[in-house]
């Protein structure tokens, strides 16, 4: 019998229905933008009060601090709308239909709209529309100012991951090609021709470490303005400048808002004259440490492995459970009462018992107390809490598989930072997008994201990475499947409330029990279970003592029966131990049921029958126009003011016109070649020449010659204006 082909997985994507974003213009609608909307707004950020805590000083800072930081906030323009799921669904539909023609799909970009009316499409910055994630080309300082001032995102970002240049040798590490990560500073054929990058590089390094610190502080000020009160910022830096950058962040965020300095082990050590550097530093600051959102990360304990985790659980009980003995003594009163245990009275040698008299009795009944030579100890099992809290030393996150970018961050580092400081549906920002690691991680874990970069190469790589990514489909807590799974985990009836697939309700996470001494000591059900089983155990103990002429207490009864015991006595002994083990199992079950649980936020349950692709996102830029050329002092080089005879510009345009006169224009097909009968210069702002040629039917046609920049690309708006 022929085997039936397996059906493909269902393809889904996460959507953020309760989130929205401001309606901004696509590039082709630039001419419909009102003049006041085209003009960049000026956003002023207050400088830090110099009378506060000590701060870092660099060349020119005193002059800068005399006035607020003023940033131009130009409008943003959408260059491209991308919805991977819609594209995949369309391909599947076409493949299924075969050669059958299909009607035009008019709602391809419906997920991007959500506007109240058709007229609202051209009323920019006045309405909200459906949320879509964003990649933005431009200076991160201006972009962040525009997001805050024009789009109302001030105080709306939950987490920022900032991986700036480390400021070591002040060389260019801009990747010049999407197909090669080989970057050699000073090599002519690897020099970037992107004006945004050239300007960013010059602005950052024009004065060495002094301009670098100015670059960082300005962006940290703008980033803080975007953070919500419970928000976090993570800044990754090398050990060469971590002391300077931490001083900067103290200045911007306040010394009281430092959360942690995280040491991140790298894949390999950087060679040095003395000790090799094997770690980077991730500085974690909060907007307000008292309001900080924090989700504790954990790692699994393994018996015999890991200092402070599983290594000390070196003993086993009869059920093969790993355990270790820990102290029962605390430095805090009260708790200095005597305790009778196994026929002997005990007191704490120094300090106080960790629990009261009633609690101590329950610990004893639960089998959690053991006697040493001079004190009592508490038996802690490995599975009481089979995980341990991750500290600020991260040795398990090194490496970035399949690098496509010269400075690509390890995804595990970004993932842990995002999971610690945000929830599904929260907004994550990355001012230095690079290859899109932050976007990829945020997309995987259901966060909204905005990434910014000055490099077209970086955004092209990030765009391709997100478009082609596949993610696990995690069970939403606000879904029928999620409610069913939650009910199974908690042994309760599923909630009858309706579901809406709201991602802000989170996922259904794996969890581990967290059994503590306190939870056992306060578990009154242990007393009830103990009393119930005593009615069975005590008569059996008395029978055993009578038959063997013993006075054994419960803890003195041997585990194995002796060979010379009569069969009847051996049966009583076996019955007693059977009841004793059953009592312990019931007590252990009660302890586990009443213990707290800790969620493993990096281990949500997955629906294996579904696969997920990225949700809708847009590619945007600061301006639809090409970037103008500036001098070393940032003054604009205006070719129109310099006249049409400007050296270089005229030579390049004349060279193109001469080539067109001789070679014409060769299009895709040989028969579509255009040969000009006449071609002359044209004194226009956009058109550089006017030519005439014969069409296929012999009629005379006129063509305007539009010549783009010698170094750079032609924008869509320039083409539209030239065509008009």
Language model segments and positions:
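Active-site-adjacent helix-turn-beta-strand microarchitecture at beta-sheet edges
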Residues: 281, 287-393, 399-400, 415
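S-adenosyl-L-methionine-dependent nucleic acid methyltransferase catalytic domains
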Residues: 1-290, 373-724
């Amino acid at each position: 019998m022929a085997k039936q082909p397996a059906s493909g997985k269902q393809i889904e994507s996460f959507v953020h229905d309760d989130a929205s974003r401001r309606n901004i213009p696509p590039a082709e609608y630039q001419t419909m933008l009102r003049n006041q909307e085209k003009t960049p707004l000026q956003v002023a950020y207050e400088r830090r009060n110099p009378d506060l805590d000590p701060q870092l000083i660099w060349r020119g800072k005193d002059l800068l601090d005399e006035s607020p930081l003023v940033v131009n906030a130009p409008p943003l323009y959408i260059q491209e709308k991308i919805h991977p799921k819609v594209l995949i669904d369309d391909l599947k539909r076409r493949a299924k239909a075969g050669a059958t023609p299909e009607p035009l799909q008019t709602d391809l970009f419906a997920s991007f709209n959500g506007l109240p009316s058709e007229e609202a499409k051209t009323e920019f910055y006045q309405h909200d529309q459906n949320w879509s994630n964003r990649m933005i080309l431009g200076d991160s300082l201006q972009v962040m100012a525009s997001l805050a001032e024009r789009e109302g995102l001030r105080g709306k970002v939950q987490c920022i991951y900032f991986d700036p240049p480390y400021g070591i040798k002040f060389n260019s590490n801009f990747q010049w090609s999407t197909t090669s990560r080989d970057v050699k500073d000073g090599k002519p054929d690897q020099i970037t021709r992107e004006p945004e990058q050239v300007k960013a590089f010059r602005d950052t390094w024009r004065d060495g470490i002094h301009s670098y610190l100015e670059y960082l502080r300005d962006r940290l000020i703008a980033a803080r303005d975007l953070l919500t009160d419970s928000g976090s910022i993570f800044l990754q830096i090398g050990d060469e400048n971590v002391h300077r950058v931490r001083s900067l962040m103290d200045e911007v965020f306040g010394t009281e808002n430092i959360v942690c300095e995280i040491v991140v082990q790298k894949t390999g050590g950087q060679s040095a004259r003395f000790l090799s550097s094997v770690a980077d530093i991730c500085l974690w600051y909060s907007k307000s440490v008292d309001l900080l959102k924090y989700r504790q990360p954990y790692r699994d304990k393994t018996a015999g492995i890991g200092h402070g985790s599983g290594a000390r659980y070196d003993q086993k009980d009869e059920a093969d459970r790993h355990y270790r003995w820990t102290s029962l003594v605390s430095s805090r009163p009260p708790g200095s009462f005597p305790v009778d245990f196994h026929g002997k009275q005990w007191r704490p040698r120094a300090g106080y018992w960790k629990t009261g008299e009633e609690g101590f009795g329950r610990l004893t009944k639960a089998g959690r107390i053991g006697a040493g030579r001079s004190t009592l100890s508490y038996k802690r099992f490995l599975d009481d809490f089979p995980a341990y809290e991750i500290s600020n030393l991260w040795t398990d996150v090194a490496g970035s598989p399949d690098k496509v970018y010269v400075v690509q961050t390890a995804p595990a580092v970004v993932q842990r930072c995002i999971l610690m400081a945000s929830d599904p549906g929260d907004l994550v920002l990355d001012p230095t997008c690079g290859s899109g690691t932050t976007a990829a991680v945020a997309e995987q874990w259901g966060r909204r994201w905005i990434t910014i970069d000055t490099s077209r190469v970086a955004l092209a790589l990030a765009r391709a990475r997100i478009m082609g990514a596949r993610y696990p489909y995690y069970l939403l807590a606000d879904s029928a499947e999620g409610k069913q799974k939650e009910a199974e985990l908690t042994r309760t009836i599923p909630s009858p409330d309706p579901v809406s697939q709201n991602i802000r309700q989170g996922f259904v996470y794996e969890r581990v029990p967290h059994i503590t001494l306190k939870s056992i000591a306060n578990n009154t059900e242990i007393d009830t279970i103990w009393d119930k089983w005593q009615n069975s155990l005590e008569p059996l103990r008395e029978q055993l003592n009578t038959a063997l002429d013993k006075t054994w207490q419960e803890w003195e009864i041997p585990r194995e029966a002796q060979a010379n015991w009569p069969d009847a006595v051996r049966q009583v002994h076996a019955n007693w131990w059977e009841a004793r083990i059953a009592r312990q199992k019931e007590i252990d079950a009660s302890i586990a049921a009443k213990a707290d649980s800790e969620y493993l936020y990096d281990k949500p349950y997955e629906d294996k029958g579904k696969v997920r692709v990225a949700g809708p996102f847009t590619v945007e830029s600061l301006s639809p126009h090409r970037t103008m050329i500036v001098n070393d002092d940032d003054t604009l080089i205006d070719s129109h003011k310099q006249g049409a005879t400007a050296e270089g510009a005229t030579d390049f345009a004349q060279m193109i016109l001469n080539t067109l006169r001789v070679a014409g224009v060769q299009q895709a097909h040989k028969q579509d070649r255009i040969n000009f009968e006449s071609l002359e210069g044209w004194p226009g702002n956009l058109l550089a020449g006017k030519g005439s040629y014969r069409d296929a039917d012999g009629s005379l046609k006129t063509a305007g010659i539009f010549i783009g920049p010698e170094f750079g690309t032609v924008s869509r708006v320039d083409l539209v204006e030239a065509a008009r």
